[in-house]
Amino acid sequence: MNPSTITNDLTVEILSRLPAKSVARFHCVSKQWGSIFGSPYFKELFLTRSSTKPRLLFAMAEKVNEEKNCVWRFFSTPQLENPYEKSSSTLVAAAEFHVKFSPDKLYICHCYDLKYFSIGYASGLIYLYGDRGEATPLICNPTTGRYAILPNRYTYRKAYSFFGFDPIDKQYKALSIFYPSGPGHSKILTFGAGHMKWRKINCPLRYDRHDIKSEGICINGVLYYLGSTSDCVKDGHGIVSDYVIVCFDIRSEKFTFIDVERFCRLINYKGKLAVIYWEDDVDIYKLYYSDVDEYVEYNINDDDINELRVWVLEDVKKQQWSKYAYTWTDDRFFRRRVSIAGGTASGEIVFSMLKYTPKQPFYVFYFNPERNTLQRVEIQGFGEVLKKTCRVCTFVNHVEDLNVHDFKQLKSVHPPLVDEPDSESD
């Protein structure tokens, strides 16, 4: 075919099938391609195609010194559709390596204690905010390595941070919640809004000083996380439980709260908030054991058949839930090495291992509540890049969205986009 006869529509159709990393690279090939990639039509077409093939995103934190400074590596693998139709007890999926992320002269740290967290995800972007407020806060694209540094969040005390996306105004916001003890103000930052700065934000008096018990998840423009009200003054405030789900509307910047009966895990279940209760689940923040493994060893029986309860929030204002219960054969492997990554669009609950160890298999598990079946999937390919034990954060439903490849917001590029092999002496 003569190149001159290729229509613009056909060019757009062909280019829309490229991976996001290639689109980022080819942006400067020609003015025509740059114009195509930047058009709203192309971005929506690309997003539509990408949304039909969601992926699991793996963020791997490798410690490089004793001060918790680390290198992040990002991988992804196709999110399996109907994994239970295969006959094998263990399926295999290949991980695609995207980028080794450790910009020069930037202190990027990660807390390796399972009780704490230092990374957030929302609509295709990663928010790295360090160990409870330490280090340089930044937002990066895990596919291309482009990033933007945020203003430092100065506080009397350390604070927890969360990351959310408003699909109406197409805005990302970072939320910083201060510790319940001591002075401090919660603050919020709008990403890409001219001169970025942290603004004070007030939490309603009822739960003004709540402790943080989970990572945040953002669903349809609302950020959710689990809080503890044990340090709140309960008299006259109507607080009926030690735990509460904090709901923060990204667009209006308003807080609402949902009381829950005890410690639980939060996931996005078919576009709705859901909480998961294990029969003997425990708030690891309250453990007197220094090691979660020690608690599991002495308190979890391999032969126990527990009840896994899934509550789906149907009406936020009325706080109405659909409640489901499933028998769950628990074991030490799940409690010691696996965390809940989230829920797929078709309703599977995805569990992922917390750590990658060289020369040992790495698994994710798809649990189908309706069928009460569990499918194990071995993820291969990490060992080609990783040579040390790493902490793993897994995110479900990762979709490549060109709207987050905004060259005006993510100005800095972190080359190379391919990893460099470690030397024999490392």
Curated annotation (Swiss-Prot):
Cysteine-cysteine disulfides: none
Alphabetical list of PANTHER family matching this protein: BNAA05G37150D PROTEIN-RELATED, F-BOX ASSOCIATED UBIQUITINATION EFFECTOR FAMILY PROTEIN
Record-linked NCBIfam families: F_box_assoc_1
InterPro entries per the UniProt record, alphabetical: F-box-assoc_dom_typ3, F-box-assoc_interact_dom, F-box-like_dom_sf, F-box_dom
Provenance organism: Arabidopsis thaliana
Ranges where the F-box domain occurs: 1-48
Protein origin, superkingdom: Eukaryota
Record-given protein name: F-box protein At2g15640
